[in-house]
Amino acid sequence: MNNYIFTSESVSDGHPDKVSDQISDALVDAGLKNGDETTRVAIETLVTTNHVTVAGEVKNFNVDNVKDIIRDKVKEIGYEQEGFHWDNLNIYDEIHAQSGDIGLGTDDFGAGDQGIMFGYATNENDAMLPAPIHYSHEILKKLKELRLDGYDFLLPDAKSQVSIQYVGGRVKRADQIVVSTQHKHGFEHSLRSPVKDAVNSVMGDLIDNETTWHINPTGNFVIGGPDGDTGLTGRKIIVDTYGGFAPHGGGAFSGKDPTKVDRSAAYMARWLAKNVVADNMADWCQIQLSYAIGVKEPTSIYVDSNGHNRTIQKYIEENIDLTPKGIIDRFGLFNFYNYSENCVYGHFGDKDVPWEKIGW
């Protein structure tokens, strides 16, 4: 099917689920910074009206200021509203020691769990991401810039959704644009200009006279963030990856140290696919990796592209270390302390992170 419309969505850093992701990853950052390669972190976060709960399992987690880290992250995101203010949060810390049974298989850098992970890349744009998810992210990044640059009636919680028309398998135009953004009371009629500015600045000629716009279609979005909807870590896994354009193995990234292959192997799969496309071996590439808990080598590797799949797979198998330790060492994942900053607007794309670097 070469002619079709495909839709993807993104959410802002103030979306409740993303607030949870950022808190979980801020604790991962702190644990890794204060620990070493024996540090293990698996932390989930729940946020709701004036309330944050963190729970999970850790090892060699030398962090004694958990509540301060949470408040600082919420303040950084920008929440100072009555129902969710960084200074008035009730915070419950239920973090405890990791099971010794898990450590038996992972202390020697076996995979931290079983699972399947996918990576994808395409030559549709410089970010090497499918256009619908790429532009969904870019719209919200631009909207945040505007919010911080004078449009102070805009508030942190926002969502976007972009429908791209493909003709002959190539990006043709934007068919539908949906943007919902939280705002201060009384400013519901002031949104159209900044939203359209944000969209037009990133999408350019893809917007035409036939593009349909939906800007705050419910009419009012004052109560937002965790005060409007409960947020949980790991509920935006499609936003985090490829917007549904490629499969997802089901495992979330945030709140997990690099021995968890849900995170590290997904980063590797993306890096592999991106380098295949960057080397002009294919216009698009999809990689699947699978692992078993405590086992170092992947249990399977699968390559799908419009190139020579067997040649690509053979090269990967013979030249790339796909063990958890090999992945961790290649990308320096135990010395990367910016997981919290990287978990918004997708984990992939035009980002200065090790798994987005070009070069074998």
Name the predicted role of every residue range.
Residues 40-61, 293-297:
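Short, charge-patterned binding micro-sites
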Residues 1-40:
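N-terminal, positively charged regions that mediate nucleic acid binding
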Residues 2, 48-49, 122-123, 242-248:
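Short connector loops/turns at beta-strand edges and beta->alpha or beta->beta junctions
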Residues 39-43, 158-164, 211-216, 282-292:
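A short glycine-rich, hydrophobically flanked beta-strand micro-motif that places a catalytic Asp/Glu
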Residues 7-10, 49-51, 68, 72-80, ...:
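Glycine-rich, mobile lid/loop segments that gate access to catalytic sites or pores
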Residues 48, 284-360:
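Internal helix-turn-beta structural module
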Residues 186-277:
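Glycine-rich anion/phosphate-binding loop at the beta-strand->alpha-helix junction
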